[in-house]
From Swiss-Prot:
MF GO annotations: protoheme IX farnesyltransferase activity
Species of provenance: Kluyveromyces lactis (strain ATCC 8585 / CBS 2359 / DSM 70799 / NBRC 1267 / NRRL Y-1140 / WM37)
Record keywords, A-Z: Heme biosynthesis, Membrane, Mitochondrion, Transferase, Transit peptide, Transmembrane, Transmembrane helix
Segment annotated as transit peptide: 1-27
Source taxonomy: Eukaryota, Fungi, Dikarya, Ascomycota, Saccharomycotina
GO CC terms in record: mitochondrial membrane
Entry protein name: Protoheme IX farnesyltransferase, mitochondrial
Family: Belongs to the UbiA prenyltransferase family.
Locations listed in the record: Mitochondrion membrane
Documented EC number(s): 2.5.1.-
Function: Converts protoheme IX and farnesyl diphosphate to heme O.
Any GO BP annotation: heme A biosynthetic process
Alphabetical list of PANTHER family matching this protein: PROTOHEME IX FARNESYLTRANSFERASE, MITOCHONDRIAL
Domain of life: Eukaryota
Keyword Translocase: no
Length: 452
């Protein structure tokens, strides 16, 4: 086989080699093979005329070339270079001469000894496995699964209600209420995310959630929710009282199952979701005081009413995303009703804050302070409502240019109302704590004693 391939290879490498192969050793070799075939057996003449075949390793090409003429040396050099490239043999010595490879029909990239050593070492080297970050793998995904900002808001509303209750508080009770409420809220939020990855994937606001990104599977979310809910309810039962534990479990069921299911069926889901926000103040109050006190229901009503200007203005600016994702929201089903409800519950804040003073939860100065904060949010809610009412009048609605201008203004008013609501709730609750009934009596008692 090699007797046929090597002459063809040499002819392809250099046209001048064809005459050499025919006139030289190659021609005598062909004649000898032909004569041996005709004779049918070997004899002394064939042994004398037989041409010696070079079987030396290619490493000794330099030795074989010694003593040959220039043409034969060039031929053997090209032949050795070609065979060297075809054999892919990298065990060459550094003293081997460099051959001219311009006539080769393929490109040969020479690799020196140092480079070959680096390649071998890189192949033998075992790359270390990347370190698994505990924070990025476990802590951050499950922290996002609990919706930390919403959970903190729920926890603070329960703590503020606990601080406003008339009965004394204990450190153990406060810690149990804080941890238990946080875990119950995290459980409800995890179930909500585990049930809605396909819908959340269609909204920009929720595309970064861990279940949507595949960092946490729905089953893992449900397992986390089960563990957090069980632990949170147990802490509330043992560290606070059974009433608070029942309210915590009810909050999980309302948010994770009823509210989440209604989001794709009816606009009443917003009212059900507002009930979820009203339960944490009841939990805080029930931790140390009976729920028969009207002050508990005033605080719950305050949190319930606050949900509408906050959420309705938020959903207004992303109404198309809700619609495309299949969520049935008032913002796109009935835009006028959406703005009207936001204003209605903003105005409801005034009598609810009045009720806190009337039922001796706060002093009467609270009416003045809270009125400024409530008026601030009601003003922007009124602007949002009035603009939407004007937008959907017959004159403006049928004029596309005017309607688009009016809708742009409504978007601005909705965004302002939303951010005002974010500041409104902590302001109202902090003012209520500062104006708690009999909080500052110790200052006046000292003055009375000094005057007496």
């Amino acid at each position: 086989m090699s007797l046929v391939i090597q002459p063809l290879l040499m002819r392809a490498l250099n046209p001048n080699l064809s005459s050499i192969l025919i006139s030289g050793r190659g021609f005598s070799l062909i004649q000898h093979r032909r004569f041996a075939f005709r004779a049918g057996s070997g004899n002394n003449n064939s042994e004398q005329n037989q041409v010696h075949i070079n079987t030396a390793p290619i490493e000794f090409t330099a030795n074989l070339l010694a003593g040959k003429n220039e043409t034969e040396a060039e031929t053997e050099g090209l032949k050795g270079t070609a065979l060297k490239a075809l054999r892919c043999n990298d065990t060459t010595s550094d003293s081997e001469p460099q051959h001219n490879m311009e006539n080769l029909p393929f490109k040969v990239k020479l690799v020196d000894k140092g480079q070959r050593k680096q390649i071998k070492e890189s192949k033998a080297r075992v790359e270390p496995r990347p370190e698994v970050s505990l924070k990025k793998t476990y802590i951050e995904p499950y922290l996002q699964l609990s919706k930390p900002r919403l959970t903190v808001l729920v926890m603070l509303s329960a703590i503020c209600s606990y601080a406003l209750s008339p009965y004394p508080a204990t450190v153990l009770q406060l810690l149990s209420l804080t941890v238990g409420t946080t875990l119950c809220s995290a459980s409800a939020n995890a179930i909500n995310m585990g049930r809605e990855p396909d819908f959340d994937r269609q909204m920009i606001r929720t595309q970064a959630r861990p279940v949507v990104r595949g960092i946490v599977s729905p089953n893992q979310a449900f397992k986390f929710a089960t563990a957090a809910g069980t632990l949170g309810t147990s802490i509330l039962w043992l560290g606070v009282n059974p009433t608070v534990a029942f309210l915590g479990f009810s909050n999980i069921a309302l948010y994770a199952w009823l509210y989440t299911s209604l989001k794709r069926k009816h606009i009443i889901n917003t009212w059900v979701g507002a009930l979820v926000g009203a339960i944490p103040p009841l939990m805080g109050w029930a931790a140390s005081s009976p729920l028969s006190h009207p002050g508990a229901w005033c605080l719950a009503g305050l949190l319930y009413a606050w949900q509408f200007p906050h959420f309705n203005t938020l959903s207004h600016n992303i109404r198309n995303e809700y619609k495309n994702a299949g969520y049935v929201m008032t913002a796109w089903k009935n835009p006028k009703l959406n703005a009207r409800v936001a204003l209605r519950y903003s105005l409801l804040m005034f009598p609810l804050c009045f009720g806190l003073s009337y039922f001796n939860v706060t002093d009467w100065y609270y009416q003045l302070d809270s009125a400024f904060v409530n008026a601030w949010m009601s003003l922007w809610a009124f602007k949002f409502y009035f603009q939407q009412k004007r937008n959907y009048s017959k004159e403006i609605y049928n004029n596309k240019t005017e309607f688009n201008k009016g809708l742009a203004m409504a978007n601005v008013y909705a965004r302002r109302t939303f951010w005002v609501s974010v500041l409104h709730l902590p302001a109202v609750l902090i003012l209520a704590i500062l104006h708690k009934k009999d909080r500052w009596d110790w200052l006046f008692e000292d003055k009375k004693q000094l005057s007496a």
